[in-house]
């Protein structure tokens, strides 16, 4: 599929993707029936190749931004700034609006990690 080609072009580290066919089905443990219950659906399977190289945050942000760019009329951010709350800021949705690369976002997060590691040093019991 076109989406699978574009995802593979991202060359995300430690992970591979392949096309997948499946049929959603409800179980007795669910309180609701899946949206496409019993229908044949197409999807993309994520295959972890190297957990040391895999960057889950970069992967998920890259996928969300790619899908938002490829399908802007069908992609919608959750109401109530849900994604902003999950990410701790509105940087992801701003990057999406500005059509920026997730790699740039990863650089900002790396700086945040560095700042936090410096901040916590005085509080560490062991070094």
Where are these regions (language model features)?
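Structural signal for terminal/edge beta-strands and the immediately following C-terminal loop/tail
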Residues: 113-127
């Amino acid at each position: 599929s076109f989406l699978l080609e574009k995802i593979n072009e991202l060359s995300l580290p430690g992970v591979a993707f392949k096309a997948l066919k499946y049929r959603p089905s409800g179980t007795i443990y669910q309180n609701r029936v899946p949206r496409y219950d019993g229908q044949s659906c197409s999807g993309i399977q994520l295959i972890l190749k190297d957990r040391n190289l895999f960057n889950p945050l970069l992967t998920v942000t890259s996928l969300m931004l790619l899908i938002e760019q490829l399908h802007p009329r069908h992609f919608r951010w959750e109401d109530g700034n849900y994604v902003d709350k999950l990410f701790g800021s509105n940087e992801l949705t701003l990057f999406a609006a500005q059509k920026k690369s997730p790699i740039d976002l990863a650089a900002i997060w790396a700086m945040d990690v560095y700042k936090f590691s410096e901040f916590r040093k005085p509080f560490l019991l062991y070094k």
